[in-house]
Protein backbone atom coordinates (compact mmCIF):
# COMPACT_ATOMS: atom_id res chain seq x y z
CA UNK A 1 0.00 0.00 0.00
CA UNK A 2 1.20 3.58 -0.57
CA UNK A 3 2.75 5.11 2.53
CA UNK A 4 1.66 8.52 3.76
CA UNK A 5 3.90 11.11 2.13
CA UNK A 6 4.03 12.90 5.46
CA UNK A 7 5.94 9.97 7.02
CA UNK A 8 9.01 11.47 5.35
CA UNK A 9 9.01 14.16 8.04
CA UNK A 10 7.09 12.49 10.89
CA UNK A 11 8.60 9.00 11.24
CA UNK A 12 11.93 7.79 12.58
CA UNK A 13 14.54 8.95 15.06
CA UNK A 14 16.25 11.25 12.59
CA UNK A 15 13.08 13.28 12.12
CA UNK A 16 13.05 14.43 15.75
CA UNK A 17 13.81 17.98 14.64
CA UNK A 18 10.99 18.00 12.09
CA UNK A 19 8.58 16.54 14.65
CA UNK A 20 9.62 19.22 17.12
CA UNK A 21 8.59 21.82 14.57
CA UNK A 22 5.33 20.01 13.84
CA UNK A 23 4.65 19.98 17.60
CA UNK A 24 5.18 23.74 17.63
CA UNK A 25 2.28 24.00 15.17
CA UNK A 26 0.01 22.14 17.60
CA UNK A 27 0.50 18.47 16.69
CA UNK A 28 0.46 15.88 19.50
CA UNK A 29 1.82 12.35 19.85
CA UNK A 30 -1.37 10.83 18.48
CA UNK A 31 -1.28 12.96 15.34
CA UNK A 32 1.86 11.59 13.73
CA UNK A 33 0.16 8.49 12.35
CA UNK A 34 -2.66 10.49 10.74
CA UNK A 35 -2.78 11.94 7.21
CA UNK A 36 -1.63 15.55 7.01
CA UNK A 37 -4.04 17.39 4.76
CA UNK A 38 -3.09 20.75 3.25
CA UNK A 39 -5.81 23.36 2.88
CA UNK A 40 -4.97 25.85 0.13
CA UNK A 41 -7.03 28.96 0.87
CA UNK A 42 -7.11 31.94 -1.47
CA UNK A 43 -8.60 34.45 0.97
CA UNK A 44 -7.85 38.07 0.17
CA UNK A 45 -9.55 41.38 0.87
CA UNK A 46 -8.84 42.53 -2.69
CA UNK A 47 -11.40 40.26 -4.36
CA UNK A 48 -15.16 40.06 -3.62
CA UNK A 49 -15.10 36.40 -4.62
CA UNK A 50 -12.56 35.74 -1.86
CA UNK A 51 -13.27 38.33 0.82
CA UNK A 52 -15.47 35.87 2.74
CA UNK A 53 -13.03 32.93 2.71
CA UNK A 54 -10.95 33.98 5.75
CA UNK A 55 -12.46 31.56 8.27
CA UNK A 56 -13.58 28.85 5.87
CA UNK A 57 -10.26 27.04 5.83
CA UNK A 58 -10.52 26.55 9.58
CA UNK A 59 -14.11 25.38 9.15
CA UNK A 60 -12.80 22.62 6.88
CA UNK A 61 -9.87 21.97 9.21
CA UNK A 62 -12.07 21.29 12.23
CA UNK A 63 -14.13 18.83 10.19
CA UNK A 64 -10.98 17.05 9.00
CA UNK A 65 -9.84 16.70 12.60
CA UNK A 66 -13.20 15.26 13.67
CA UNK A 67 -12.81 12.34 11.26
CA UNK A 68 -9.17 11.51 11.91
CA UNK A 69 -6.99 13.83 9.87
CA UNK A 70 -4.50 16.61 10.62
CA UNK A 71 -5.27 19.86 8.79
CA UNK A 72 -2.70 22.53 7.92
CA UNK A 73 -3.87 25.65 6.12
CA UNK A 74 -1.85 27.99 3.92
CA UNK A 75 -2.75 30.86 1.63
CA UNK A 76 -2.03 31.72 -1.97
CA UNK A 77 -2.60 34.83 -4.06
CA UNK A 78 -5.72 35.89 -5.95
CA UNK A 79 -5.95 38.63 -8.58
CA UNK A 80 -9.29 40.35 -9.24
CA UNK A 81 -9.57 40.54 -13.01
CA UNK A 82 -12.29 43.17 -12.84
CA UNK A 83 -10.18 45.53 -10.73
CA UNK A 84 -7.05 44.77 -12.78
CA UNK A 85 -8.99 45.34 -16.02
CA UNK A 86 -8.26 48.23 -18.37
CA UNK A 87 -4.72 49.00 -17.18
CA UNK A 88 -1.35 47.30 -16.85
CA UNK A 89 -2.57 45.33 -13.85
CA UNK A 90 -4.18 42.91 -16.31
CA UNK A 91 -0.71 41.88 -17.49
CA UNK A 92 -0.39 39.96 -14.22
CA UNK A 93 -3.67 38.06 -14.28
CA UNK A 94 -2.88 35.04 -16.44
CA UNK A 95 0.72 34.70 -15.21
CA UNK A 96 -0.71 34.57 -11.68
CA UNK A 97 -2.26 31.21 -12.63
CA UNK A 98 1.23 29.73 -12.90
CA UNK A 99 2.30 31.37 -9.64
CA UNK A 100 -0.73 29.90 -7.86
CA UNK A 101 -0.06 26.43 -9.29
CA UNK A 102 3.59 26.63 -8.27
CA UNK A 103 2.80 27.94 -4.78
CA UNK A 104 0.43 25.05 -4.09
CA UNK A 105 3.01 22.57 -5.38
CA UNK A 106 5.73 24.21 -3.29
CA UNK A 107 3.73 24.01 -0.06
CA UNK A 108 2.39 20.50 -0.62
CA UNK A 109 5.74 19.02 -1.63
CA UNK A 110 7.93 20.98 0.79
CA UNK A 111 5.84 19.71 3.70
CA UNK A 112 5.01 16.28 2.23
CA UNK A 113 1.25 16.77 2.49
CA UNK A 114 -0.81 13.64 1.97
CA UNK A 115 -3.87 15.32 0.45
CA UNK A 116 -5.24 18.69 -0.50
CA UNK A 117 -8.42 20.75 -0.14
CA UNK A 118 -8.53 23.66 -2.58
CA UNK A 119 -10.59 26.67 -1.49
CA UNK A 120 -10.77 28.75 -4.63
CA UNK A 121 -13.30 30.90 -6.45
CA UNK A 122 -12.27 33.45 -9.04
CA UNK A 123 -10.80 33.52 -12.51
CA UNK A 124 -7.21 32.25 -12.26
CA UNK A 125 -7.37 30.71 -8.82
CA UNK A 126 -9.46 27.65 -9.60
CA UNK A 127 -7.41 26.89 -12.76
CA UNK A 128 -4.11 27.42 -10.92
CA UNK A 129 -5.14 25.11 -8.10
CA UNK A 130 -6.48 22.59 -10.62
CA UNK A 131 -3.15 22.54 -12.41
CA UNK A 132 -1.36 21.99 -9.10
CA UNK A 133 -3.71 19.21 -8.02
CA UNK A 134 -3.19 17.30 -11.25
CA UNK A 135 0.55 17.91 -11.10
CA UNK A 136 0.79 16.60 -7.52
CA UNK A 137 -1.72 13.76 -8.01
CA UNK A 138 -2.60 13.38 -4.35
CA UNK A 139 -6.21 13.12 -3.10
CA UNK A 140 -7.98 16.44 -3.59
CA UNK A 141 -11.39 18.07 -3.16
CA UNK A 142 -12.28 21.48 -4.57
CA UNK A 143 -14.71 23.73 -2.74
CA UNK A 144 -15.16 27.27 -3.99
CA UNK A 145 -16.53 30.42 -2.41
CA UNK A 146 -19.61 30.48 -4.64
CA UNK A 147 -21.27 33.08 -6.88
CA UNK A 148 -22.53 36.44 -5.69
CA UNK A 149 -26.17 37.37 -5.93
CA UNK A 150 -27.24 39.32 -9.01
CA UNK A 151 -27.78 43.04 -8.54
CA UNK A 152 -31.12 44.78 -8.67
CA UNK A 153 -32.20 48.39 -9.23
CA UNK A 154 -35.43 50.15 -10.10
CA UNK A 155 -33.60 51.78 -13.01
CA UNK A 156 -33.31 48.48 -14.90
CA UNK A 157 -35.90 45.93 -15.98
CA UNK A 158 -33.41 43.09 -15.57
CA UNK A 159 -30.97 42.01 -12.89
CA UNK A 160 -27.50 43.54 -12.98
CA UNK A 161 -23.92 42.36 -12.99
CA UNK A 162 -20.46 43.88 -13.38
CA UNK A 163 -20.75 44.22 -17.16
CA UNK A 164 -23.86 46.38 -16.86
CA UNK A 165 -21.90 48.86 -14.76
CA UNK A 166 -19.12 48.99 -17.37
CA UNK A 167 -21.49 49.43 -20.29
CA UNK A 168 -23.57 52.17 -18.67
CA UNK A 169 -20.42 54.09 -17.70
CA UNK A 170 -19.44 54.38 -21.36
CA UNK A 171 -22.95 55.40 -22.46
CA UNK A 172 -22.75 59.16 -22.94
CA UNK A 173 -26.54 59.46 -22.73
CA UNK A 174 -26.61 58.02 -19.19
CA UNK A 175 -26.65 60.51 -16.32
CA UNK A 176 -24.02 60.44 -13.58
CA UNK A 177 -26.80 59.50 -11.17
CA UNK A 178 -27.77 56.45 -13.24
CA UNK A 179 -24.15 55.36 -13.56
CA UNK A 180 -23.73 55.70 -9.79
CA UNK A 181 -26.89 53.66 -9.15
CA UNK A 182 -25.67 50.85 -11.43
CA UNK A 183 -22.26 50.97 -9.75
CA UNK A 184 -23.81 50.63 -6.29
CA UNK A 185 -26.17 47.84 -7.37
CA UNK A 186 -24.18 45.63 -9.78
CA UNK A 187 -22.16 43.65 -7.21
CA UNK A 188 -24.25 43.49 -4.02
CA UNK A 189 -22.63 40.61 -2.13
CA UNK A 190 -19.48 38.60 -1.68
CA UNK A 191 -18.89 35.87 -4.24
CA UNK A 192 -17.72 35.46 -7.81
CA UNK A 193 -19.47 37.72 -10.33
CA UNK A 194 -23.05 36.59 -10.84
CA UNK A 195 -23.09 35.55 -14.50
CA UNK A 196 -21.56 32.63 -16.38
CA UNK A 197 -18.24 34.40 -16.43
CA UNK A 198 -14.85 32.69 -16.08
CA UNK A 199 -14.94 32.10 -12.33
CA UNK A 200 -18.36 30.47 -12.25
CA UNK A 201 -17.65 28.57 -15.47
CA UNK A 202 -14.53 27.01 -13.95
CA UNK A 203 -16.24 26.18 -10.66
CA UNK A 204 -18.98 24.43 -12.64
CA UNK A 205 -16.35 22.51 -14.59
CA UNK A 206 -14.78 21.13 -11.41
CA UNK A 207 -18.12 19.38 -10.86
CA UNK A 208 -18.05 17.89 -14.36
CA UNK A 209 -14.42 16.83 -13.94
CA UNK A 210 -15.51 15.00 -10.80
CA UNK A 211 -13.29 16.92 -8.38
CA UNK A 212 -15.91 18.87 -6.40
CA UNK A 213 -19.26 18.25 -4.75
CA UNK A 214 -22.65 18.83 -6.43
CA UNK A 215 -23.67 22.47 -6.11
CA UNK A 216 -20.10 23.75 -5.97
CA UNK A 217 -20.55 25.87 -9.10
CA UNK A 218 -23.99 27.32 -8.41
CA UNK A 219 -24.79 27.55 -4.68
CA UNK A 220 -24.70 31.23 -3.71
CA UNK A 221 -21.83 32.43 -1.52
CA UNK A 222 -24.31 34.02 0.86
CA UNK A 223 -26.52 30.96 1.33
CA UNK A 224 -26.37 28.78 4.44
CA UNK A 225 -26.44 25.65 2.27
CA UNK A 226 -22.95 26.43 1.05
CA UNK A 227 -21.53 25.79 4.52
CA UNK A 228 -22.46 22.13 4.08
CA UNK A 229 -20.20 21.90 1.02
CA UNK A 230 -17.22 22.96 3.13
CA UNK A 231 -18.08 20.55 5.93
CA UNK A 232 -18.62 17.67 3.50
CA UNK A 233 -15.32 18.49 1.76
CA UNK A 234 -13.52 18.11 5.09
CA UNK A 235 -15.02 14.68 5.70
CA UNK A 236 -14.60 13.58 2.09
CA UNK A 237 -10.89 14.34 1.82
CA UNK A 238 -10.14 12.05 4.78
CA UNK A 239 -12.22 9.32 3.14
CA UNK A 240 -10.22 9.75 -0.08
CA UNK A 241 -7.00 9.46 1.92
CA UNK A 242 -8.14 6.14 3.38
CA UNK A 243 -9.13 4.89 -0.08
CA UNK A 244 -5.73 5.69 -1.57
CA UNK A 245 -3.27 5.10 1.26
CA UNK A 246 -5.31 2.28 2.79
CA UNK A 247 -6.65 0.62 -0.34
CA UNK A 248 -4.60 1.93 -3.29
CA UNK A 249 -7.82 2.89 -5.08
CA UNK A 250 -6.72 4.89 -8.16
CA UNK A 251 -10.11 6.61 -8.36
CA UNK A 252 -9.21 8.42 -5.13
CA UNK A 253 -6.56 10.38 -7.04
CA UNK A 254 -7.24 13.36 -9.32
CA UNK A 255 -5.61 11.71 -12.35
CA UNK A 256 -7.77 8.64 -11.79
CA UNK A 257 -10.84 10.88 -11.92
CA UNK A 258 -9.90 13.63 -14.39
CA UNK A 259 -9.25 11.29 -17.31
CA UNK A 260 -9.62 12.11 -20.99
CA UNK A 261 -13.29 11.13 -20.77
CA UNK A 262 -13.77 13.48 -17.81
CA UNK A 263 -12.12 16.34 -19.69
CA UNK A 264 -14.45 15.66 -22.61
CA UNK A 265 -17.40 15.72 -20.20
CA UNK A 266 -16.21 19.03 -18.74
CA UNK A 267 -15.82 20.59 -22.17
CA UNK A 268 -19.22 19.23 -23.19
CA UNK A 269 -20.74 20.98 -20.18
CA UNK A 270 -18.84 24.16 -21.01
CA UNK A 271 -20.16 24.20 -24.57
CA UNK A 272 -23.70 23.38 -23.43
CA UNK A 273 -23.80 26.17 -20.87
CA UNK A 274 -22.07 28.81 -23.03
CA UNK A 275 -19.17 29.23 -20.63
CA UNK A 276 -16.30 31.66 -20.86
CA UNK A 277 -13.72 31.17 -23.62
CA UNK A 278 -11.08 31.34 -20.88
CA UNK A 279 -12.18 27.88 -19.80
CA UNK A 280 -10.69 26.48 -23.00
CA UNK A 281 -7.34 28.00 -22.08
CA UNK A 282 -7.51 26.57 -18.57
CA UNK A 283 -8.74 23.09 -19.52
CA UNK A 284 -5.92 22.80 -22.06
CA UNK A 285 -3.43 23.77 -19.35
CA UNK A 286 -4.93 21.36 -16.82
CA UNK A 287 -4.94 18.50 -19.33
CA UNK A 288 -1.21 18.96 -19.85
CA UNK A 289 -0.61 18.75 -16.09
CA UNK A 290 -2.71 15.56 -16.01
CA UNK A 291 -0.78 14.19 -19.01
CA UNK A 292 -4.10 13.74 -20.81
CA UNK A 293 -4.35 13.94 -24.59
CA UNK A 294 -6.89 16.74 -24.94
CA UNK A 295 -6.43 19.69 -27.29
CA UNK A 296 -8.24 22.14 -29.58
CA UNK A 297 -8.98 19.35 -32.06
CA UNK A 298 -11.03 17.53 -29.42
CA UNK A 299 -12.78 20.76 -28.44
CA UNK A 300 -13.59 21.55 -32.07
CA UNK A 301 -15.16 18.12 -32.55
CA UNK A 302 -17.28 18.51 -29.41
CA UNK A 303 -18.41 22.01 -30.39
CA UNK A 304 -19.95 20.63 -33.60
CA UNK A 305 -22.21 18.10 -31.88
CA UNK A 306 -23.06 19.54 -28.45
CA UNK A 307 -26.13 21.82 -28.32
CA UNK A 308 -26.52 24.86 -26.11
CA UNK A 309 -28.79 23.90 -23.21
CA UNK A 310 -28.29 26.85 -20.88
CA UNK A 311 -28.07 30.58 -21.54
CA UNK A 312 -26.93 32.86 -18.74
CA UNK A 313 -25.57 36.41 -18.43
CA UNK A 314 -23.66 37.83 -20.26
CA UNK A 315 -25.35 35.91 -23.09
CA UNK A 316 -28.80 36.98 -21.87
CA UNK A 317 -29.91 39.43 -19.16
CA UNK A 318 -32.68 37.04 -18.10
CA UNK A 319 -30.69 34.49 -16.10
CA UNK A 320 -27.80 34.53 -13.62
CA UNK A 321 -26.15 31.80 -11.55
CA UNK A 322 -28.88 31.94 -8.91
CA UNK A 323 -31.33 30.96 -11.68
CA UNK A 324 -29.08 28.11 -12.85
CA UNK A 325 -29.07 26.75 -9.31
CA UNK A 326 -32.86 26.95 -9.09
CA UNK A 327 -33.03 24.94 -12.33
CA UNK A 328 -30.85 22.19 -10.89
CA UNK A 329 -27.33 23.56 -11.24
CA UNK A 330 -24.60 21.68 -13.04
CA UNK A 331 -26.28 18.32 -12.52
CA UNK A 332 -29.43 19.65 -14.16
CA UNK A 333 -27.39 20.30 -17.31
CA UNK A 334 -25.38 17.07 -17.03
CA UNK A 335 -28.62 15.11 -16.73
CA UNK A 336 -29.94 16.51 -19.99
CA UNK A 337 -26.62 15.89 -21.73
CA UNK A 338 -26.56 12.31 -20.46
CA UNK A 339 -30.07 11.64 -21.72
CA UNK A 340 -28.93 13.02 -25.06
CA UNK A 341 -26.09 10.49 -25.17
CA UNK A 342 -23.47 13.24 -25.00
CA UNK A 343 -21.55 12.21 -21.86
CA UNK A 344 -19.42 9.33 -20.65
CA UNK A 345 -21.29 8.59 -17.42
CA UNK A 346 -19.03 5.73 -16.38
CA UNK A 347 -16.32 8.03 -15.05
CA UNK A 348 -15.87 8.27 -11.26
CA UNK A 349 -16.09 11.40 -9.10
CA UNK A 350 -14.75 12.23 -5.65
CA UNK A 351 -18.23 11.65 -4.22
CA UNK A 352 -19.80 8.91 -6.36
CA UNK A 353 -18.80 5.61 -7.91
CA UNK A 354 -19.80 6.95 -11.31
CA UNK A 355 -21.19 10.07 -12.91
CA UNK A 356 -24.31 8.05 -13.72
CA UNK A 357 -24.88 7.42 -10.01
CA UNK A 358 -24.35 11.09 -9.24
CA UNK A 359 -26.82 12.19 -11.91
CA UNK A 360 -29.43 9.73 -10.64
CA UNK A 361 -29.26 11.34 -7.22
CA UNK A 362 -28.55 15.01 -7.99
CA UNK A 363 -30.47 15.77 -11.21
CA UNK A 364 -33.69 17.42 -10.02
CA UNK A 365 -35.48 16.35 -13.19
CA UNK A 366 -35.30 12.69 -12.12
CA UNK A 367 -34.36 12.63 -8.44
CA UNK A 368 -37.06 11.87 -5.89
CA UNK A 369 -34.79 12.86 -3.00
CA UNK A 370 -36.57 15.69 -1.17
CA UNK A 371 -33.29 16.94 0.30
CA UNK A 372 -31.91 17.41 -3.22
CA UNK A 373 -35.04 19.26 -4.29
CA UNK A 374 -34.74 21.49 -1.23
CA UNK A 375 -31.02 22.09 -1.84
CA UNK A 376 -31.62 23.53 -5.30
CA UNK A 377 -34.32 25.87 -4.04
CA UNK A 378 -31.62 27.89 -2.23
CA UNK A 379 -32.00 31.44 -3.52
CA UNK A 380 -30.92 35.06 -3.08
CA UNK A 381 -31.96 37.28 -0.18
CA UNK A 382 -31.31 40.60 -1.90
CA UNK A 383 -29.33 41.94 1.06
CA UNK A 384 -25.92 43.52 0.54
CA UNK A 385 -23.33 41.59 2.55
CA UNK A 386 -19.76 40.30 2.60
CA UNK A 387 -20.60 37.47 5.00
CA UNK A 388 -20.70 33.84 3.89
CA UNK A 389 -23.70 31.63 4.73
CA UNK A 390 -25.61 34.65 6.06
CA UNK A 391 -29.07 33.90 4.66
CA UNK A 392 -31.36 30.91 4.09
CA UNK A 393 -33.87 32.17 1.51
CA UNK A 394 -35.54 29.53 -0.66
CA UNK A 395 -37.34 29.77 -3.95
CA UNK A 396 -40.98 28.67 -3.61
CA UNK A 397 -40.53 26.31 -6.56
CA UNK A 398 -37.83 24.81 -8.76
CA UNK A 399 -37.43 25.66 -12.44
CA UNK A 400 -37.75 22.25 -14.09
CA UNK A 401 -39.24 23.57 -17.33
CA UNK A 402 -36.88 21.96 -19.83
CA UNK A 403 -38.74 23.46 -22.82
CA UNK A 404 -38.63 27.17 -21.96
CA UNK A 405 -36.77 27.39 -18.64
CA UNK A 406 -33.19 28.34 -17.80
CA UNK A 407 -31.91 24.82 -18.54
CA UNK A 408 -33.30 23.12 -21.65
CA UNK A 409 -33.44 19.54 -22.85
CA UNK A 410 -31.60 18.52 -26.01
CA UNK A 411 -34.94 18.52 -27.83
CA UNK A 412 -35.60 22.12 -26.79
CA UNK A 413 -32.01 23.42 -26.98
CA UNK A 414 -31.33 27.13 -27.39
CA UNK A 415 -29.30 26.17 -30.46
CA UNK A 416 -28.31 22.91 -32.13
CA UNK A 417 -24.64 23.78 -31.81
CA UNK A 418 -23.18 24.82 -28.49
CA UNK A 419 -21.95 28.08 -27.05
CA UNK A 420 -18.25 27.83 -27.99
CA UNK A 421 -16.50 27.25 -31.30
CA UNK A 422 -12.96 26.87 -32.64
CA UNK A 423 -12.17 28.70 -35.88
CA UNK A 424 -9.20 28.16 -38.18
CA UNK A 425 -7.90 29.77 -41.35
CA UNK A 426 -4.92 31.73 -42.63
CA UNK A 427 -5.49 34.29 -39.86
CA UNK A 428 -5.37 31.62 -37.13
CA UNK A 429 -3.51 28.59 -38.42
CA UNK A 430 -3.42 26.99 -34.98
CA UNK A 431 -6.93 28.11 -34.10
CA UNK A 432 -8.88 30.76 -32.23
CA UNK A 433 -12.05 30.68 -30.15
CA UNK A 434 -15.40 32.46 -30.08
CA UNK A 435 -18.25 32.29 -27.58
CA UNK A 436 -21.08 31.75 -30.06
CA UNK A 437 -23.59 31.88 -27.22
CA UNK A 438 -23.02 35.63 -27.09
CA UNK A 439 -23.09 36.25 -30.86
CA UNK A 440 -26.27 37.36 -32.59
CA UNK A 441 -27.17 34.92 -35.37
CA UNK A 442 -27.30 37.78 -37.89
CA UNK A 443 -23.50 38.10 -37.72
CA UNK A 444 -22.46 34.44 -37.61
CA UNK A 445 -21.03 35.17 -41.06
CA UNK A 446 -19.30 38.55 -41.11
CA UNK A 447 -16.92 40.32 -43.48
CA UNK A 448 -15.45 43.73 -42.83
CA UNK A 449 -12.50 46.10 -42.98
CA UNK A 450 -9.71 45.75 -40.43
CA UNK A 451 -9.16 48.52 -37.92
CA UNK A 452 -5.79 47.64 -36.38
CA UNK A 453 -4.55 48.57 -32.90
CA UNK A 454 -1.23 47.59 -31.35
CA UNK A 455 -2.60 47.39 -27.81
CA UNK A 456 -5.82 47.23 -25.83
CA UNK A 457 -5.24 50.78 -24.58
CA UNK A 458 -5.05 52.12 -28.13
CA UNK A 459 -8.20 50.21 -29.09
CA UNK A 460 -10.16 51.61 -26.14
CA UNK A 461 -9.08 55.14 -27.03
CA UNK A 462 -10.04 54.56 -30.67
CA UNK A 463 -13.46 53.14 -29.85
CA UNK A 464 -14.28 55.98 -27.46
CA UNK A 465 -13.08 58.48 -30.10
CA UNK A 466 -15.52 56.96 -32.64
CA UNK A 467 -12.76 55.69 -34.95
CA UNK A 468 -14.56 52.35 -35.25
CA UNK A 469 -17.53 52.25 -37.61
CA UNK A 470 -20.26 49.73 -38.29
CA UNK A 471 -18.88 46.90 -40.40
CA UNK A 472 -15.33 47.13 -39.04
CA UNK A 473 -13.27 44.27 -37.64
CA UNK A 474 -11.29 45.63 -34.71
CA UNK A 475 -7.90 43.88 -34.54
CA UNK A 476 -5.99 44.11 -31.25
CA UNK A 477 -2.60 42.42 -31.45
CA UNK A 478 0.62 41.91 -29.50
CA UNK A 479 -1.55 41.12 -26.49
CA UNK A 480 -0.88 37.37 -26.47
CA UNK A 481 0.87 35.38 -23.72
CA UNK A 482 4.30 36.35 -25.03
CA UNK A 483 3.53 39.67 -26.72
CA UNK A 484 1.54 41.33 -23.94
CA UNK A 485 2.98 39.75 -22.04
CA UNK A 486 0.25 38.05 -20.06
CA UNK A 487 -2.60 37.85 -22.57
CA UNK A 488 -4.85 40.64 -21.31
CA UNK A 489 -8.63 40.34 -21.22
CA UNK A 490 -10.56 42.66 -23.53
CA UNK A 491 -13.73 43.38 -21.56
CA UNK A 492 -13.47 47.15 -21.88
CA UNK A 493 -13.22 47.21 -25.70
CA UNK A 494 -16.22 44.90 -26.08
CA UNK A 495 -18.22 46.78 -23.45
CA UNK A 496 -17.49 50.10 -25.15
CA UNK A 497 -18.46 48.73 -28.56
CA UNK A 498 -21.76 47.69 -27.00
CA UNK A 499 -22.24 51.12 -25.42
CA UNK A 500 -21.67 52.72 -28.85
CA UNK A 501 -24.42 50.57 -30.36
CA UNK A 502 -21.89 48.51 -32.33
CA UNK A 503 -22.28 45.21 -30.46
CA UNK A 504 -24.06 43.59 -33.41
CA UNK A 505 -22.36 45.59 -36.15
CA UNK A 506 -18.66 44.96 -35.54
CA UNK A 507 -16.28 42.11 -34.81
CA UNK A 508 -13.27 42.12 -32.51
CA UNK A 509 -10.27 39.89 -33.12
CA UNK A 510 -7.28 39.53 -30.81
CA UNK A 511 -4.38 37.30 -29.79
CA UNK A 512 -5.37 38.30 -26.27
CA UNK A 513 -8.38 36.89 -24.51
CA UNK A 514 -11.80 37.94 -23.31
CA UNK A 515 -13.44 38.21 -19.95
CA UNK A 516 -16.18 35.73 -19.23
CA UNK A 517 -18.38 38.82 -19.22
CA UNK A 518 -17.81 39.41 -22.92
CA UNK A 519 -20.50 39.01 -25.55
CA UNK A 520 -20.72 39.93 -29.23
CA UNK A 521 -18.60 38.72 -32.15
CA UNK A 522 -15.44 38.61 -30.07
CA UNK A 523 -12.76 36.21 -31.29
CA UNK A 524 -9.75 35.60 -29.09
CA UNK A 525 -6.78 33.30 -28.49
CA UNK A 526 -5.61 33.80 -32.11
CA UNK A 527 -2.71 31.39 -32.55
CA UNK A 528 0.08 31.81 -33.39
CA UNK A 529 0.06 35.21 -31.69
CA UNK A 530 1.63 38.24 -33.35
CA UNK A 531 4.78 38.08 -31.22
CA UNK A 532 5.34 34.50 -32.42
CA UNK A 533 5.00 35.37 -36.10
CA UNK A 534 1.26 34.86 -36.45
CA UNK A 535 -0.62 36.24 -39.45
CA UNK A 536 -2.49 38.63 -37.14
CA UNK A 537 0.78 40.59 -37.05
CA UNK A 538 0.54 41.17 -40.82
CA UNK A 539 -2.92 42.75 -40.92
CA UNK A 540 -3.14 46.38 -42.02
CA UNK A 541 -5.95 48.92 -41.80
CA UNK A 542 -8.53 48.36 -44.52
CA UNK A 543 -7.72 44.69 -45.16
CA UNK A 544 -10.81 42.55 -45.59
CA UNK A 545 -11.39 39.84 -42.98
CA UNK A 546 -14.03 37.13 -43.31
CA UNK A 547 -15.47 35.25 -40.33
CA UNK A 548 -17.69 32.23 -40.94
CA UNK A 549 -18.77 30.56 -37.69
CA UNK A 550 -20.88 27.80 -39.31
CA UNK A 551 -17.90 26.83 -41.48
CA UNK A 552 -15.47 27.37 -38.56
CA UNK A 553 -13.31 29.65 -40.73
CA UNK A 554 -11.50 32.95 -40.26
CA UNK A 555 -9.43 34.38 -43.10
CA UNK A 556 -7.48 37.46 -44.10
CA UNK A 557 -8.57 38.02 -47.71
CA UNK A 558 -5.16 38.65 -49.25
CA UNK A 559 -3.25 36.75 -51.93
CA UNK A 560 -0.27 34.63 -50.95
CA UNK A 561 2.23 36.94 -52.65
CA UNK A 562 1.11 39.93 -50.57
CA UNK A 563 1.20 37.89 -47.38
CA UNK A 564 4.68 36.57 -48.22
CA UNK A 565 6.01 40.10 -48.80
CA UNK A 566 4.50 41.35 -45.55
CA UNK A 567 5.97 38.40 -43.68
CA UNK A 568 9.41 39.11 -45.09
CA UNK A 569 9.08 42.75 -43.99
CA UNK A 570 8.00 41.67 -40.50
CA UNK A 571 10.91 39.24 -40.23
CA UNK A 572 13.30 42.07 -41.09
CA UNK A 573 11.60 44.58 -38.78
CA UNK A 574 11.02 42.18 -35.91
CA UNK A 575 7.68 40.90 -34.65
CA UNK A 576 6.84 43.76 -32.33
CA UNK A 577 4.22 46.54 -32.16
CA UNK A 578 4.52 49.07 -34.95
CA UNK A 579 3.56 51.94 -32.66
CA UNK A 580 5.15 52.68 -29.27
CA UNK A 581 3.08 51.83 -26.23
CA UNK A 582 3.75 53.10 -22.71
CA UNK A 583 3.98 49.79 -20.92
CA UNK A 584 6.38 48.78 -18.18
CA UNK A 585 7.26 45.11 -18.40
CA UNK A 586 8.89 43.98 -15.18
CA UNK A 587 11.39 41.17 -14.81
CA UNK A 588 8.63 38.92 -13.43
CA UNK A 589 6.57 39.42 -16.58
CA UNK A 590 9.63 39.00 -18.80
CA UNK A 591 10.33 35.64 -17.17
CA UNK A 592 6.77 34.51 -17.95
CA UNK A 593 6.99 35.80 -21.54
CA UNK A 594 10.25 33.96 -22.12
CA UNK A 595 8.59 30.59 -21.49
CA UNK A 596 4.98 31.30 -22.51
CA UNK A 597 3.34 29.19 -25.20
CA UNK A 598 0.50 30.32 -27.45
CA UNK A 599 -3.14 30.06 -26.43
CA UNK A 600 -3.73 26.83 -28.36
CA UNK A 601 -1.35 25.19 -25.88
CA UNK A 602 -3.12 26.73 -22.88
CA UNK A 603 -0.56 29.55 -22.54
CA UNK A 604 1.41 27.34 -20.17
CA UNK A 605 5.14 27.73 -19.74
CA UNK A 606 7.29 25.65 -22.05
CA UNK A 607 9.51 24.18 -19.36
CA UNK A 608 11.26 22.03 -21.96
CA UNK A 609 13.27 25.18 -22.71
CA UNK A 610 14.84 24.80 -19.27
CA UNK A 611 16.37 21.42 -20.11
CA UNK A 612 16.33 18.25 -18.02
UniProtKB/Swiss-Prot annotation:
InterPro entries: Dihydro-acid_dehy_C, DihydroxyA_deHydtase, DiOHA_6PGluconate_deHydtase_CS, ILV_EDD_C, ILV_EDD_N, IlvD/EDD_N. Pathway: Amino-acid biosynthesis; L-isoleucine biosynthesis; L-isoleucine from 2-oxobutanoate: step 3/4; Amino-acid biosynthesis; L-valine biosynthesis; L-valine from pyruvate: step 3/4. Its EC number is 4.2.1.9. Its cofactor is [2Fe-2S] cluster; Mg(2+). HAMAP family: IlvD. Belongs to the IlvD/Edd family. This is Dihydroxy-acid dehydratase. The gene is ilvD.
Amino acid sequence: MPEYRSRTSTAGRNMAGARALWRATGMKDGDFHKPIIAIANSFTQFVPGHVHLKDLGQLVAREIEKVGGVAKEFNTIAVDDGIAMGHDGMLYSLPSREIIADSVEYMANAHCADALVCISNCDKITPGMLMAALRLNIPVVFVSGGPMEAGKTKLSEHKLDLVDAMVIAADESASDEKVAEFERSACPTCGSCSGMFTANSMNCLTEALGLSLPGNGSTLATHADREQLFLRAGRLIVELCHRWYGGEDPTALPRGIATQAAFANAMTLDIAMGGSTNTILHLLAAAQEAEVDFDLTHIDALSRRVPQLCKVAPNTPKYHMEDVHRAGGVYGILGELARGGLLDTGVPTVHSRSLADAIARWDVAVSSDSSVQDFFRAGPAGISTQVAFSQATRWPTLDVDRAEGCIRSVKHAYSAEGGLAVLRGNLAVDGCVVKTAGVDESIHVFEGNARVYESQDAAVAGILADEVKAGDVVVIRYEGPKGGPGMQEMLYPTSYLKSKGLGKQCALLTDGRFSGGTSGLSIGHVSPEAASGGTIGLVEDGDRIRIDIPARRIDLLLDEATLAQRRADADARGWKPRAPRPRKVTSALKAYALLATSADKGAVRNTALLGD
